[in-house]
Design a protein with these regions (language model features):
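Active-site-adjacent beta-strand/loop module that shapes the phosphate/pyrophosphate-binding cleft
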Residues: 93, 101-124
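Acidic, metal-coordinating catalytic segment for phosphate/diphosphate chemistry
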Residues: 1-42
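A short coil-to-beta-strand element that immediately follows conserved catalytic motifs
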Residues: 14-15, 91-100
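Conserved beta-strand segments that form the floor/walls of ligand-binding pockets within enzyme
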Residues: 24, 64, 112
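Short glycine/serine/proline-enriched coil/turn segments at secondary-structure junctions
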Residues: 34, 62, 104-107
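Structured beta->alpha junctions
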Residues: 17, 46, 69, 101-102
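Conserved Nudix-box catalytic region and its N-terminal flanking loop in Nudix hydrolases
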Residues: 43-87
């Protein structure tokens, strides 16, 4: 990030206690921390935990995990419940956080969860 996302002024590096050198806008007089998207992905299991559900998205040939972006003012946990309902119409019975990972190509921090849904199959 080279320019302030509020005013467009060129940022300079400035020392911030306990943080190190952080981009700073001399016009707004504010530190500018990185901005990135936040998403969730889910390893989705049936109640018996012996089947893994993956989806096929928008005509792409490979199956993927159920995933989606976290909306503004939404928690990752609320997003996973919403995305599961939107993507496959199922309710989440349980979930457990697994790990997070940053993807530079899409500037996205993804929170990965294991999820148990309310059905043995999508046909129920």
């Amino acid at each position: 990030m080279n320019y302030c996302y509020e005013c467009g002024h060129k940022l300079v590096m400035k020392e911030l206690e306990h943080e190190g050198r952080i981009p700073f806008c001399t016009s707004c007089r504010q530190f500018r921390f990185p901005i990135f998207s936040t998403a969730i992905s889910m390893v989705t299991l049936n109640p018996k935990r012996d089947k893994l559900l993956m989806i096929q998205q928008y005509g792409k040939p490979n199956n993927i995990l159920v995933a989606g972006y976290v909306n503004k003012e939404e928690s990752a946990e609320d997003a996973l419940v919403r995305e599961m309902q939107e993507e496959i119409g199922r309710k989440v019975l349980q979930y457990r956080f697994l790990k997070s990972e940053y993807f530079p190509k899409t500037n996205t921090l993804i929170f990965n969860f294991a999820v148990i849904i309310d059905s043995e199959s999508l046909e129920d």
